[in-house]
């Protein structure tokens, strides 16, 4: 009785499986490869783990979704139609976690720099 070989990584009828990017695997919108390239080019550390760019891409994606969402809610509550830099600044400073994260950040056209 002949033995059948089992193929690894094949999908379907003898076809090759498609490679899946780290961005797709992590179900993110921000490119994990771009984040990794930025981390490597920035020379922030001698070594970089495989999961650090994935984690950072997820954090960036979360922040870019959360801050405009909070600003939109604040704009609706105050009867405004547009999200302005002032609203963004107000949202960041009113949220405890965002306030500590952006403690030393100055948003342009909102708070003038110190002379």
Swiss-Prot record:
Example of a GO biological process term: nucleosome assembly
Keyword Nucleus: yes
This protein's record includes keyword rRNA-binding: no
Subcellular location: Nucleus; Chromosome
Residue segments, region Disordered: 1-21
GO molecular function: DNA binding; protein heterodimerization activity; structural constituent of chromatin
Signal peptide: none
Tissue specificity comment: Present in mature sperm.
Entry superkingdom: Eukaryota
Region (Docking domain): 87-115
InterPro entries in alphabetical order: Histone-fold, Histone_H2A
GO CC, alphabetical: euchromatin; nucleosome; nucleus
Family named by the database record: Belongs to the histone H2A family.
Domain comment in the entry: The docking domain is responsible for the weaker heterodimerization with H2B.
Quaternary data: The nucleosome is a histone octamer containing two molecules each of H2A, H2B, H3 and H4 assembled in one H3-H4 heterotetramer and two H2A-H2B heterodimers. May be incorporated into a proportion of nucleosomes, replacing one or more H2A molecules.
More details: In contrast to other H2A histones, it does not contain the conserved residues that are the target of post-translational modifications.
Protein name: Histone H2A-Bbd type 1
Organism field: Homo sapiens
């Amino acid at each position: 009785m002949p033995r059948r070989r089992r193929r690894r990584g094949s999908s379907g009828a003898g076809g090759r499986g498609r490679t899946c990017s780290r961005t797709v695997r992590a179900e993110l919108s921000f490119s994990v490869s771009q984040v990794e390239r930025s981390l490597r080019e920035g020379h922030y550390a001698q070594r970089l783990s495989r999961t650090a760019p994935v984690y950072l891409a997820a954090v960036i994606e979360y922040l870019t979704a959360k801050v405009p969402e909070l600003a939109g809610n604040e704009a609706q509550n105050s009867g405004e139609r547009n999200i302005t830099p002032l609203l963004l600044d107000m949202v960041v400073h009113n949220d405890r976690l965002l306030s500590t994260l952006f403690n030393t950040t100055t948003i342009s056209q909102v708070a003038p720099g110190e002379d």
